[in-house]
A protein has these predicted regions:
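Active-site mouth loops of central-metabolism enzymes
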Residues: 11-27, 69-74, 145-162
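Conserved anion-binding
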Residues: 79, 91-167
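Short beta->alpha connector loops at strand-helix junctions that form conserved
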Residues: 43-46, 73, 94-97
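Conserved small/polar residues in nucleotide/adenosyl-binding loops
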Residues: 170-171
Length: 171
C-alpha cells in the first residue's frame, strides 16, 4: 500500500505524535489503534517473534486507517530491515545501535540507491506489487521511510553526538 508517512511529517514539523508498542498478532488491534487516533505503533518483533505473514497482516490492519506501522526488527541486519519494509512498514526501529557506523549501516539498509543499499524488488507489497513506476516508487520510499536507531546502552549515550551527525540514521 503506497502511503505517505505522516509520522515523518509530524516529527519534521516539530509536532507531538502519539504511539504505542504492540507485542501480539491481531490485525484488529492495529486497526483499532488507528481508529481511536494513534499516529503510529511499533510492532515489537525483537521481544515477541512473529513470522513474516503475521507481520504483513498487522501492517494490513494498519492500512485500513491512517496509523503508521513501524517494525522493531530483531537486529541491525540488511535482511531484517528489508523484509520489514518490503512488507509495507513505513519505518523500522533497530535495537542496540551503539555507534555511528551501526547507525549509518541501518540508514543504508533502509534506503534505496542513491541514498542506500536496500535491495529492490518491484513485485513486493510495499511497491504496490509493481503497479507504480519504479523510479517514482524508489523516490517515494526513500522520502517516506522512517529510520530509528534505538539508543539503549551507555556506549550509545557516549557516542550520541557522533551518531546524530548523520541525519539519515535518525529520520
Amino acid at each position: 500500500m503506497i502511503k505517505e508517512n505522516k509520522l515523518k511529517k509530524i516529527i519534521k514539523d516539530g509536532g507531538c505524535a502519539i504511539g504505542t508498542f504492540v507485542k501480539f498478532n491481531d490485525p484488529s488491534v492495529a486497526e483499532i489503534l488507528g481508529i481511536v487516533g494513534y499516529d503510529f505503533f511499533v510492532l515489537d518483533n525483537e521481544h515477541v517473534t512473529m513470522n513474516r505473514e503475521s507481520m504483513v497482516e498487522m501492517i494490513r490492519g494498519a492500512n485500513t486507517t491512517d496509523i503508521v506501522p513501524i517494525v522493531r526488527v530483531r537486529k541491525n541486519e540488511d535482511v531484517e530491515v528489508l523484509q520489514a519494509l518490503d512488507s509495507g512498514a513505513l519505518g523500522v526501529q533497530v535495537p542496540n545501535v551503539d555507534t555511528f557506523e551501526q547507525a549509518s549501516n541501518l540508514a543504508r539498509y533502509a534506503k534505496y540507491t542513491p541514498d542506500g543499499t536496500r535491495g529492490f524488488s518491484p513485485g513486493v507489497r510495499a511497491a504496490f506489487y509493481g503497479q507504480m513506476d519504479k523510479h517514482e516508487y524508489v523516490k517515494f520510499a526513500n522520502e517516506n521511510t522512517l529510520v530509528v536507531s534505538h539508543c539503549e546502552t551507555v556506549t550509545c549515550v557516549e557516542n550520541i553526538d557522533e551518531i546524530l551527525t548523520d541525519r539519515k540514521s535518525v529520520v
